[in-house]
Amino acid sequence: MLEFEVLKTDARTGEGANAHPGSHARRGQLTLTHGVVQTPIFMPVGTYGTVKGVMPQSLHEMGAQIILGNTFHLWMRPGLDVMKQFGGLHRFESWDKPILTDSGGFQVWSLGDMRKISEEGVKFASPVNGDKLFLTPEISMQIQTVLNSDIVMQFDECTPYDTKGHITTESEARSSMELSLRWAKRCVAEFDKLENPNALFGIVQGGMYQNLRHESLEALVELDLPGYAVGGVSVGEPKEEMQRIMAHTPHRLPADKPRYLMGVGTPEDLVEGVGAGIDMFDCVMPTRNARNGHLFTRFGDLKIRNARHKADEQPLDTTCTCYTCKGRTMPDGSTSGGFSRAYLHHLDRCGEMLGPMLASIHNLHYYLNLMQEIRDALDAGRFGEFAARFRTDRLRGV
């Protein structure tokens, strides 16, 4: 099931002190099988059925409303027999809120020379044991039905920006986009055949070519799907190219359906994406960067392994209320005090497991809190003012 309601739009679209120029930002509510999601929303990525380094309890405490699972990797391990035994991904990973699963298309694309794409599907060697495997739109729908994810993504071909230095031509992008459209129709047919009660999203492709994006969008809209995603961005293209596609595509999708920007991105990308009309985001950046000592704060990014933090008694971000920065909440409402930059620097330099765990908690809290602040600003009709202040703060530096 899926119900989506737009609660408020950034109606002033560039007029007045609080407006965001050209804004298509909107505040919404998404009702799914396993719960209600307030949008715009960021979705933490749980590739193997876990958000790396973060306990489910911590995800609940920091306000995660929906997380991702990776169809391809869960198909490889633990496999469908185990998933069937548990009745899907929710019970398996002990998560009672909504889950979105990707189709496996991006992971197959990332295998490069290890895979062969045809009209029927993709043949490739398993990265786990080398077995020869075949993934089709139908099989992707079957896997995601077993996973019982609230949102199922169509199987698509992710159009690359370049391949070994060769920039994808319009002709190549068209061929890829049209294949994804044919696969989308097969996904719909199989999804309906399986009587999957959840929601299937289509994925707009077309590379960096606006005319192809428009054709893909129009063809997918004809399928009248519950929601739509913008795919094939943040795949190596210059930032200006992604921004050009974002200015063109999202607001042309149906206003009464949720819009999802796949695999993006930085805090700045999220704010710009909301302004472009996006409702949903996901990215591995908060946790991946955390594992590499790269932290996000209100006043810019911080590299905790730098020597200047060796004796720094400050928390990562004095404005942050996460466990890493503030510590436990005591019975009287006070906090126990968080961890210093010096301690986090020490953990990082020693390779201690707690280091990336605390860093991941902070980064995910930062992202989720950023989205809460965006929702609050939209509720108050002050998104433009918020976006301007956000940019100023981030440029200030830590």
Swiss-Prot record:
GO CC, alphabetical: cytosol
Details of cofactor binding: Binds 1 zinc ion per subunit.
UniProt keywords, alphabetically: Glycosyltransferase, Metal-binding, Queuosine biosynthesis, Transferase, tRNA processing, Zinc
Binding of Zn(2+), residues: 320, 322, 325, 362
EC number: 2.4.2.29
Family matches, as Pfam families: TGT
Molecular function in Gene Ontology: metal ion binding; tRNA-guanosine(34) queuine transglycosylase activity
Pathways involved: tRNA modification; tRNA-queuosine biosynthesis
Chain intervals for the UniProt region annotation (RNA binding): 263-269, 287-291
Job description of the protein: Catalyzes the base-exchange of a guanine (G) residue with the queuine precursor 7-aminomethyl-7-deazaguanine (PreQ1) at position 34 (anticodon wobble position) in tRNAs with GU(N) anticodons (tRNA-Asp, -Asn, -His and -Tyr). Catalysis occurs through a double-displacement mechanism. The nucleophile active site attacks the C1' of nucleotide 34 to detach the guanine base from the RNA, forming a covalent enzyme-RNA intermediate. The proton acceptor active site deprotonates the incoming PreQ1, allowing a nucleophilic attack on the C1' of the ribose to form the product.
Complex formation: Homodimer. Within each dimer, one monomer is responsible for RNA recognition and catalysis, while the other monomer binds to the replacement base PreQ1.
Name used for this protein in its record: Queuine tRNA-ribosyltransferase
Gene that encodes it: tgt
